[in-house]
Each structure stands twice: as C-alpha cells, then as structure tokens.
Amino acid sequence: MLSKDYIFSVFIFSIIFSCSKPPFFMDYLNFDGQWPTSEKVVFDIGTSTDQPVNLMIYIRNNQRYPFSNIFLIARLKTGDSLLLCDTLEYAMTNAQGQWLGKGFLEVKESKLWWKENYELPTIENLNVQLEHALRFNGSEKSM
C-alpha cells in the first residue's frame, strides 16, 4: 500500500468566464499534507451563469508526489442528476522528471483544463466532485 504522504496539499477548483472576466466561482480545499485517495472533493457552486465558462482544476504538489501524472474522475452534478463525467489525465512532470506548473522551491501549482467554453445549464445546486482515478495495474479498485 502506498503512503498517503505523497498526495497533494491543496486542491482548487475554478470556473472562469471565457472572456477573461473575474472568476465566476473559485474555491480551494487544504489538506493536512495529503489528499486521502478514498476521499472525494466536493465544491458547491450554487447557481450557474448564462455565459460560457472554462472549468479548471488547480493542484499544488511537491516532490513527495511520486508519479509523473495524475488521473482524476471529475463530475458536474445537480442533486442526484449527473450532468457531466470525465476521466482526466494530466502530466505533472516533463520527460526529464522536472515538475510542471508554476512556483518556486518545492511547491508547484498546476492549472489543469477540464472544459473550455462550457455552457453550464441554468439550474441551481450545482456541484463538482473530484476523486482519484489511480489504479493498480489490472485492478478496478482505487489506490
């Protein structure tokens, strides 16, 4: 079993208008040095907007994360209705093993695009759920 110490310390979700206006929604969660692999992250957005938005995920990590990429399952929901579900893969390092993202010292922040110019449905009680999609080879169970 892998140690939980390698998981990200901060998780940020942002919905930004396509026209570079201030964010429609931006929130973050701090973890005590780790994001438990069994824990879903939930962001309650509330109401939507009638303008297309960019859905982005910001992740801060350090050298304790032992992988060169990350797999996430991202869901956009309202109540029990699933509006959008994607399995996402993002590179976290370049080919030489150097961290991607911005920052100095050991902490790097990566801006990960989920959807560009996405038209949110005009409904209330929207939320975004993010969870790890890392799997051991040949297993359906998450790490």
Regions found by a protein language model. Give the residues of each.
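Short acidic/polar inter-strand loop motif in beta-rich domains
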Residues: N62-R64, E109-L112, E131-E140
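An anionic, turn-rich surface loop/hairpin at beta-sheet edges
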Residues: L88-E119
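Noncatalytic modules at the cell exterior or secretory-pathway interfaces
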Residues: D50-I57, Y118-L134
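C-terminal motif of bacterial Sec signal peptides marking the signal peptidase cleavage site
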Residues: I16-S18
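Bacterial signal peptide processing site
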Residues: S20-P23
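Post-signal-peptide N-terminal segment of Sec-exported extracytoplasmic proteins
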Residues: V41-N69
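Short coil-to-beta strand junction motifs in C2/discoidin
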Residues: P66-L72, S142-M143
